[in-house]
Amino acid sequence: MDSGKLYSFAFKGLLTEEALDKAGRKSKDDFSAVWESETSKRLGLSLMDEEFVVKSRRMAVVYTAICSFENSVREFIAKKLLEEKGENWWDLCVKKEIRTNAENRKKSEKDVRWLTARGNSMIYYTEFGDLISIMAKSENWKFFEVHVGKIEWAKQIIETLEKSRNIIMHSGELAPTDIERVGMYIRDWIRQVG
């Protein structure tokens, strides 16, 4: 492709972006605000005690960070084991007890057909703490050591975040120092593991 055609293509793309913005294109942030407003109405948040709603919204931000972190660790483990052991990694790399618990959880949730499934991989049916057991299993550790460094470090992060998540999930509120710790651990993990 010659440079004139490439320039024309890129310039037309920029003009299209500008026209869409002027026409009122919704950004992902706008979508989130609209979705939150509509969902709040559907849930009847305006009927609830404002103090509880405010506290819950503060913790929702923290929960979002922890949930995103947890799912990124799940994906990291699943991708690494798929890459190293192939399609059958779940059976080869996960202890029977963890597999059985996850399979029972999936079956139990499947019996409630109106409830949305957690995910398309069995790793989404494990508990947060199980992720450490999967990484630390002697046959698996060599795949993770290069990324994680020390399993004790990863265990401390996951256990702390799991406890923090449980406080939020059971209607508790984390102190500002606890929130800072959650953020610190997530940032440390991302810097170390990616």
Task: Set out the residue ranges of the language-model regions.
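Amphipathic alpha-helical interface elements
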Residues: 1-194
